């Protein structure tokens, strides 16, 4: 079992993900610079939070053209598991691996707080260790985390059982309280909360461990 963590210019949560996976759970982890195309030997890839390429045009809009993501599309097509956290979720929507878009929070302010979540679906292998309606508390930290999509896309997400996580108190105005979604096959999960920041009781909680522990079967 081995995880790759993509590093874009402007990423700032890549080391947090590596620490959570390798430091807390002993899962071998290596960094993937945005220019690489080599995903050989990896069982899963994580797109971390941060501000890829400065997010100058739109969150994730430049990162979607990175060479590593060309290989990632092929990796997903082969059934490889991908986790997009915060900015990583934004990148996945820009890349077209997940539907919808992440826009400015309804308050127009950056939000940094713990969010109470409900597991809506455990169909994705990333949430196989949880039961539906489990409660999780995970940190959020974003200015553009408001999930939006068309009515048609929302119906499709519901039909595919692809809404993975919902906010209990919806801090950013996301449609249908959505905090995380999967692709149709379930091997790709994008979420705005930060599970890597909730893997050690010393810093306030372990509710994020389950997503990474799922890699261990």
Curated annotation (Swiss-Prot):
Coiled coil: none annotated. InterPro entries: Class_I_gatase-like, PRibForGlyAmidine_synth_PurQ. Gene3D superfamilies: 3.40.50.880. The active site is at residues 86, 194, 196. Keywords: ATP-binding, Cytoplasm, Glutamine amidotransferase, Hydrolase, Ligase, Nucleotide-binding, Purine biosynthesis. One of its GO terms (molecular function) is ATP binding. One of its GO terms (cellular component) is cytoplasm. Its main location: cytoplasm. Residues 2-217 form the Glutamine amidotransferase type-1 domain. Pathway: Purine metabolism; IMP biosynthesis via de novo pathway; 5-amino-1-(5-phospho-D-ribosyl)imidazole from N(2)-formyl-N(1)-(5-phospho-D-ribosyl)glycinamide: step 1/2. It is found in: Cytoplasm. One of its GO terms (biological process) is 'de novo' IMP biosynthetic process. It catalyses: N(2)-formyl-N(1)-(5-phospho-beta-D-ribosyl)glycinamide + L-glutamine + ATP + H2O = 2-formamido-N(1)-(5-O-phospho-beta-D-ribosyl)acetamidine + L-glutamate + ADP + phosphate + H(+); L-glutamine + H2O = L-glutamate + NH4(+). Its EC number is 6.3.5.3, 3.5.1.2. CDD domains: GATase1_FGAR_AT (cd01740). It comes from the Bacteria. Part of the FGAM synthase complex composed of 1 PurL, 1 PurQ and 2 PurS subunits. Part of the phosphoribosylformylglycinamidine synthase complex involved in the purines biosynthetic pathway. Catalyzes the ATP-dependent conversion of formylglycinamide ribonucleotide (FGAR) and glutamine to yield formylglycinamidine ribonucleotide (FGAM) and glutamate. The FGAM synthase complex is composed of three subunits. PurQ produces an ammonia molecule by converting glutamine to glutamate. PurL transfers the ammonia molecule to FGAR to form FGAM in an ATP-dependent manner. This is Phosphoribosylformylglycinamidine synthase subunit PurQ. The lineage of its organism: Bacteria, Bacillati, Cyanobacteriota, Cyanophyceae, Synechococcales.
């Amino acid at each position: 079992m081995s995880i790759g963590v993509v590093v874009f210019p402007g990423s700032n949560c890549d080391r947090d993900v590596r620490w959570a996976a390798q430091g807390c759970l002993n899962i071998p982890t290596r960094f993937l610079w945005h220019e690489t195309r080599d995903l050989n030997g990896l069982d899963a890839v994580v797109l971390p939070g941060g501000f890829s390429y400065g997010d100058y045009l739109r969150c994730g809009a430049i990162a979607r053209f990175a060479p590593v993501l060309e290989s990632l599309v092929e990796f997903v097509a082969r059934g490889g598991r991908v986790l997009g956290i915060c900015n990583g979720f934004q990148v996945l929507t820009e890349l077209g691996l997940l539907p919808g878009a992440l826009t400015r929070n309804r308050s127009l302010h950056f939000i940094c707080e713990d969010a109470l979540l409900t597991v809506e679906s455990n169909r994705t292998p990333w949430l196989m260790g949880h039961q539906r309606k489990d409660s999780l508390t995970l940190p959020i930290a974003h200015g553009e985390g408001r999930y939006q999509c068309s009515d048609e896309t929302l119906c499709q997400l519901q039909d595919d059982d692809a809404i993975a996580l919902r906010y209990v108190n919806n801090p950013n105005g996301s449609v249908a309280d959505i905090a995380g979604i999967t692709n149709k096959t379930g091997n790709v999960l994008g979420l705005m909360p930060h599970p890597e920041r909730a893997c050690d009781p010393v810093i306030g909680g372990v509710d994020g461990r389950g997503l990474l522990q799922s890699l261990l079967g």
